[in-house]
Design a protein with these regions (language model features):
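Beta-lactamase-like hydrolase cores
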Residues: 18-64
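Structured C-terminal helix/loop/strand segments within mature extracytoplasmic catalytic/sensor domains
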Residues: 20-31, 35, 62, 125-130, ...
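Short, well-structured active-site flanking segments
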Residues: 24, 79-95, 180-185
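Flexible glycine/proline-enriched surface loops and loop-helix/loop-strand junctions
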Residues: 55-60, 104-105, 113-120, 147-154, ...
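Active-site SXXK
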Residues: 62-86, 111
């Protein structure tokens, strides 16, 4: 695993990244510039116990999590029974949806991979406000706000989470530091698995994109493993533009992962 090549080694106050080196990565700026987007990227190297950060101000700024909230939503749902298991089928109501992939029945795995909003709104509805608020506090997830309604608070309501908080949440999930069962953790991990490279690296990740809100954002958060051992955790977001609405987040992430851990090379 490559070590972060520091442009500037510094302590980034308030990032909840104590006892770890934190490096401001000016060289990552070129990846964002290539797509003409503003954004942030944080990558944690568990072997070196160090963080690389592009845009130290934005990495602490809270945004709507959008569909990345499917991760805590699913964990909570499994814990409280809003999702019975990986085989439970959530039935499409037959009404037209924005994408064809949404117009069918779904399970936990397909609902996560196809980012099925209506399914996870049903999960949140089953969980209810009181239990949702309690679990967000236990997870220390963002500002823990559920203002805006139980089916909308992560899409256009009051919930806000920063890229650093997203990355730390994924670390807690993978390291077994969230108050959830091994079963819930395993099922959500399985649903987040995206691909495995020829080099033996496995990517677990989730996208998220807001609609028409005051601060639109596109997310990609996740981690990479080599033979079951995490080698990098990451969280990034960009402000979508008309010229490059969504593709930038994946391209930038893959470029940085290739640079830092040889992902996809």
């Amino acid at each position: 695993l490559k070590r972060f090549a520091p442009s500037l080694l510094m302590l980034l106050a308030g990032l909840n990244a104590t006892a770890a080196d934190q490096v401001l990565r000016h060289d990552w700026k070129r990846h964002f510039a290539a797509y003409g987007v503003e954004g942030t990227f944080v990558l944690f190297d568990p072997e070196a116990n160090s963080y690389g950060v592009h845009n130290v101000v934005r990495v602490r700024h809270g945004y709507l999590p959008a569909s990345t909230f499917k991760i805590p939503n699913a964990l909570i749902g499994l814990e409280v029974g809003s999702i019975r298991d990986e085989r439970e089928v959530f039935r499409w109501d037959g009404h037209p949806k924005p994408r064809a992939a949404l117009e069918r029945d779904h399970t936990l795995d397909s609902g996560m991979k196809d980012s099925v909003a209506w399914m996870f709104q049903e999960v949140a509805h089953r969980t209810g406000k009181a239990r949702m608020k309690e679990w967000l506090a236990q997870f220390e997830y963002g500002n823990q706000s559920i203002e805006g309604g139980i089916e909308h608070f992560w899409l256009q309501g009051g919930l806000r989470v920063s890229a650093m908080e997203q990355m730390e949440f994924l670390r807690k999930l993978e390291e077994g530091r969230l108050p959830v069962s091994a079963r819930s953790r395993r099922l959500v991990r399985d649903a987040l698995r995206i691909e495995e490279t020829a080099g033996g690296l496995t990517l677990y990740a989730k996208t998220g994109t807001t609609g028409a809100v005051r601060e639109p954002v596109a997310w990609w958060v996740g981690w990479v493993e080599r033979r079951g051992v995490p080698v990098a955790y990451f969280a990034m977001n960009v402000t979508p533009t008309k010229a490059e609405p969504l593709g930038a987040r994946e391209a930038i992430t893959r470029a940085i992962l290739a640079q830092e851990i040889g992902y996809g090379l």
